[in-house]
Amino acid sequence: MKCTLVSTLFAITNILVAHAQVSNSSDTLDVQFANSTNSYIEGKFNSTDEAFNSSASWSLAAQQKKISNAAVYDVGGWNGSLYRSNRSAVADHQPGKKQDAAISQISDGQIQATASGPETTAATTPSSTANVSVYEGAGMKVESKNMGYIVGVAALLFL
């Protein structure tokens, strides 16, 4: 009976952890600076198909990036709210460019980011892929290791 109870608790734990991972997925924006300038947001977030709405180009020979307008992301945090935006998603990878980013919450967690400044600048990043933290939610975020620990302690108490 105890084994059945423990097995049931572990099964419930796996279901809860999977649900927590889907509902509260990682707040990571994966921006790829390439010829296609495609980007995607992992997890439950939605984004436009093109990172810079066809206004960015990448020159491999001169290693220069031309950026005039950033993307519009529909990220929608917990309960569709935005808690903290990252204003340096592009500027972090263009140290030689003074980035003026205007990020505002429009509605339902939609962010519009516009960048202005010199059109071309030297790119010093060796890699063309960068992981940028977009925002973080307020309150407790259930992680798999924390959830497993909590349910594991609860299972030991029932034994």
Swiss-Prot record:
GO molecular function, one term: structural constituent of cell wall
Regulation: induction: Expression is regulated by AZF1.
Any one annotated GO CC term: fungal-type vacuole
Propeptide residues, chain positions: 138-159
Signal peptide: 1-20
Entry-linked Pfam families: PIR
Repeat (PIR1/2/) residue spans along the chain: 101-114
Keyword Signal among UniProt keywords: yes
Top-level taxonomic group: Eukaryota
Record keywords: Cell membrane, Glycoprotein, GPI-anchor, Lipoprotein, Membrane, Signal
Cross-referenced InterPro entries: Yeast_PIR_rpt
Main location class: membrane
This protein's name: Probable GPI-anchored protein ANS1
Organism: Saccharomyces cerevisiae (strain ATCC 204508 / S288c) (Baker's yeast)
Lineage, broadest ranks: Eukaryota, Fungi, Dikarya, Ascomycota, Saccharomycotina
Gene: ANS1
